[in-house]
């Protein structure tokens, strides 16, 4: 009944039906119930597994007259489920529906029959068990609280790639629990739903043989629990009278992120979880999306694409950099080396922000940042040699030449290296001006400083004898003007 009217979960001497109780989480929950003195009937399809499970569970009995039995039933057949529950010598006090299966795979690579099978094994089996059980349970009104527990999945609140046949039906199971919770008030029956995350079970091991490499990679970030640990968390939630039960921190965050109209079990704590998930989820989602995008590029599923929603940020950042450069202009004329040295960290930080916002996914990571920074340093040396080849000082004022090259590199090599990495095909497209559809205005922003610096070199040899003609002032000014012009034109074209 949730926070305002929760009932305790009584198991001792009660008759409890556990579907999916022959192995995995179902058997672990059944064992917890047996240890509490319950009379447990486990339900599954394979008789040999049921017999082995009953023998194992019987060793945990705490009462001499305690009963542990099994029923072999096809839960995807309503006639079989209804017949089984009707012929039980007792009316179930509690029902734990843990049966189900998961068939992972990419949506387009799964046969349509898989979706039908998942619907039958996960959702319709839940409907059949609940329907037959409630019809019998409503005929009596005991003095103690009764409970129906549906085992769903965290994937009902956090669906990810590879589970398009599984996540939707588990979401349907959760919604079924929401509907039954209110309707079962008519019969004084409590309803709860358990949303566990990854559990080490026989089913999980079988799933791993079917999962695409990407799904295994994404799940490598998750915490994993044994069936016994997950069963213990489930029992704790039942003891508290919770409606939505989770077994780890991500589950608590996501169940509150997607709570909808479900009752609150602990409002203060759950509002806090909801706030944290509201703030954290966009970053976590972007991380997951980035893994998918990178996988798509590596496997050739698609071509890179540029971000289309960063034009305001790009123009704002360009204006900010241009303003800082304008305010530093006198310093550039008076002491070019000091200005270039002191402003370099500013350009580096701003370009890092620009890369993160606009570069094709995946977003900036420490590894990509280091690769881009290393390429920037190497690029600055190459640009220095190019400048020297065109007449820049080699021995005298080489420090000016190098910091001019480093400034050019942070606006050209750094964003490109962080975005294109070591993809030679994309570098060829950039050099041949064919990658605008890939990196958008970044292509123009990279060419802009180069062209601007080239034009900026024109006034240096002229006999005007002006302070701003000193090396490499006009080249730096031209590079910044070229960058600003290219950024504006690039965003307009994009």
UniProtKB/Swiss-Prot annotation:
GO terms for cellular component: endoplasmic reticulum membrane. The chain crosses the membrane at residues 148-168, 264-284, 312-332, 370-390, 402-422, 444-464, 473-493. Its main location: endoplasmic reticulum. Disulfide bonds: none annotated. It comes from Schizosaccharomyces pombe (strain 972 / ATCC 24843). The lineage of its organism: Eukaryota, Fungi, Dikarya, Ascomycota, Taphrinomycotina. A motif (GXSXG) lies at residues 20-24. This is PIGF/3-ketodihydrosphingosine reductase fusion protein. NADPH binds at residues 20, 22, 24, 45, 49, 74-75. GO terms for molecular function: 3-dehydrosphinganine reductase activity; NADPH binding. Its EC number is 1.1.1.102.
């Amino acid at each position: 009944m949730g926070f305002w009217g929760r009932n305790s979960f009584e198991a001792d001497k009660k008759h409890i039906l556990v579907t999916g109780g022959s192995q995995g989480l179902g058997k672990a929950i059944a064992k917890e119930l047996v240890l509490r003195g319950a009379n447990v009937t486990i339900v599954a399809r394979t008789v040999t597994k049921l017999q082995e499970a009953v023998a194992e569970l019987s060793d945990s009995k705490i009462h001499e007259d305690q009963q542990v039995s099994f029923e072999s039933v096809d839960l995807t057949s309503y006639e079989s489920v209804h017949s089984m529950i009707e012929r039980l010598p007792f009316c179930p006090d509690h029902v734990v529906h843990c049966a189900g299966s998961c068939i992972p795979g990419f949506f387009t690579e799964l046969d349509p029959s898989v979706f039908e099978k998942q619907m039958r094994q996960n959702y319709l089996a839940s409907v059949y068990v609940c329907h037959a059980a409630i019809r019998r349970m409503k005929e009596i009104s005991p003095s103690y609280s009764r409970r129906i527990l549906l085992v769903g999945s965290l994937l009902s609140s956090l669906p990810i790639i590879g589970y398009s046949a599984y996540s939707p039906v588990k979401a349907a199971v959760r919604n079924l629990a929401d509907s039954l919770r209110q309707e079962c008030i008519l019969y004084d029956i409590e309803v709860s739903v358990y949303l566990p995350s990854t559990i080490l079970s026989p089913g999980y091991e079988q799933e791993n043989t079917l999962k695409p490499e990407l799904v295994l990679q994404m799940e490598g970030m998750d915490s994993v629990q044994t069936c016994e640990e997950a069963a213990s968390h489930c029992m704790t939630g039942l003891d508290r009278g919770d409606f939505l039960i989770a077994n780890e921190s991500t589950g608590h965050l996501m169940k509150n992120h997607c709570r909808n109209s479900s009752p609150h079990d602990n409002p203060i704590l759950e509002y806090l979880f909801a706030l944290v998930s509201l703030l954290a989820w966009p970053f976590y989602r972007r991380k997951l999306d980035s893994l998918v995008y990178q996988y798509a590029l590596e496997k050739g599923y698609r071509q890179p694409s540029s971000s289309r929603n960063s034009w305001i940020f790009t123009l704002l950042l360009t204006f900010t950099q241009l303003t800082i450069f304008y305010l530093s202009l006198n310093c550039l004329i008076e002491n070019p080396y000091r200005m270039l040295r002191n402003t370099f960290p500013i350009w580096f930080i701003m370009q890092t922000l620009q890369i993160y916002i606009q570069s094709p996914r995946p977003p900036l990571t420490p590894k990509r940042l280091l690769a881009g920074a290393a390429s920037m340093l190497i690029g600055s040396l190459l640009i220095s040699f190019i400048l020297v080849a065109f007449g820049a000082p080699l021995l005298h004022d080489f420090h000016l030449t190098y910091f001019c090259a480093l400034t050019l590199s942070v606006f050209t090599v750094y964003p490109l290296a962080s975005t294109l990495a070591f993809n030679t095909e994309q570098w060829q497209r950039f050099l041949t001006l064919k990658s605008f559809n890939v990196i958008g205005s970044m292509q123009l922003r990279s060419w802009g400083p180069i062209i601007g610096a080239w034009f900026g070199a024109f006034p240096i040899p002229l006999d005007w004898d002006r302070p701003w003609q000193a090396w490499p002032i006009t080249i730096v000014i031209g590079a910044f003007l070229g960058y600003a012009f290219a950024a504006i034109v690039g965003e307009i074209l994009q």
